[in-house]
Amino acid sequence: MSSEQTREVYERARLGQSVTLGARPAVLAVDFSRGFTDPECAMGADLTKEVEATRGLLDVAREAELPVIFTTIGFEENLKDGSLWLEKAPGLAELQVGGKWVEIDPRLGRREEETIILKKGASAFFGTNLPSILVSQHVDTIIMCGATTSGCIRATAIDLLQYGYPTLVPRECVGDRAQEPHEANLFDIQAKYADVVSAEEASAYIESVARKSGASV
């Protein structure tokens, strides 16, 4: 099927419509830990451009006083908390609690008051208290960054939709260890689960929300 035929099929199915954004967004940075942003780790890749783009977006969000939430994958040394995922992807065993690969990439400049959620599954919702964190902070929209596009970003995008959170995914702020799955999953995310936008568009949305709320930008 050609690209034009694919476009026609998706248009006929009315996929890829835009979601209505709310007025209380948060930024969710999924698994931008050293284990995914440093190619020295078996699970990692050089995501320098994506990390730098995300840092810029985070700084805009911080200036607007938006909630910023990080997630990281980590397992106990005995790996008994890893379930079937470690059998399917044994490289994840390098991500052990207390080790450097679980640390949030320091280039993102995480602040002490910014929440870190430890997770053991693909979705940021699976087995975590993310739902209660979002409810307690009255969040109604998510701007999602992180890695990997084909794994935890996609899984979290699906759950965000199912939990009722309109979501923006800035394309410059998500990455994968290979380009083909990255592009394919961005295509699917845009078609079915969230709005894939530019980092500039995401920043403009944050600034518009801040102006309406009276926060500094």
List where the protein language model places each region.
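Short acidic-hydrophobic, aromatic-tinged amphipathic segments that line or gate anion-handling sites
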Residues: 117, 194-204
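A short glycine-rich beta-strand->turn/loop micro-motif centered on a GG-aromatic cluster
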Residues: 143-146, 164-179
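Active-site-proximal loop->helix
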Residues: 177-190
